[in-house]
Swiss-Prot record:
The gene is MT-CYB. The lineage of its organism: Eukaryota, Metazoa, Chordata, Craniata, Vertebrata. PROSITE patterns: CYTB_NTER. The cytochrome bc1 complex contains 11 subunits: 3 respiratory subunits (MT-CYB, CYC1 and UQCRFS1), 2 core proteins (UQCRC1 and UQCRC2) and 6 low-molecular weight proteins (UQCRH/QCR6, UQCRB/QCR7, UQCRQ/QCR8, UQCR10/QCR9, UQCR11/QCR10 and a cleavage product of UQCRFS1). This cytochrome bc1 complex then forms a dimer. Belongs to the cytochrome b family. This is Cytochrome b.
Length: 134
């Protein structure tokens, strides 16, 4: 009798993706930070879009729009806090991801490492332009 997770078409996809994933035995929890970066980035984009629907950048009404988001919009307070704390979590994951690369010697792959450094500088410049300057 065959195992259903290896013979059923839907279960076979799940089995190959999660259970019998061909990864080395030396993989550790440090390798999860790339996935966490994707989750944090998706959260930032979604909460940022929803917050931008109610925010006005006019200097006279900006504070009023933030209080409107927190008080009048359904779950607006949680969107604001998710967006603020998600940015911190994104950078924590980003620095841990770079630290993992330094620890495991990924800088020897110069092309991949240089692209990563360019992305790091682009993310830091975007954060500076979007959060520090306004």
């Amino acid at each position: 009798m065959t195992n259903i997770r290896k013979s059923h078409p839907l279960f076979k996809i799940i089995n190959d993706s999660f259970i019998d994933l061909p990864t080395p035995s030396s993989i550790s929890s440090w390798w999860n930070f790339g996935s966490l970066l994707g989750v944090c980035l998706a959260t930032q984009i979604l909460t940022g879009l929803f917050l931008a629907m109610h925010y006005t950048s006019d200097t006279d009404t900006a504070f009023h729009s933030v209080t409107h988001i927190c008080r009048d919009v359904n779950y607006g307070w949680i969107l604001r806090y998710l967006h603020a704390n998600g940015a911190s979590m994104f950078f924590i994951c980003l620095f841990l991801h770079v630290g993992r690369g330094i620890y495991y010697g990924s800088y020897t792959f110069s092309e991949t490492w240089n692209i990563g450094i360019i992305l790091l500088f682009a993310v830091m410049a975007t954060a500076f332009m979007g959060y520090v300057l306004p």
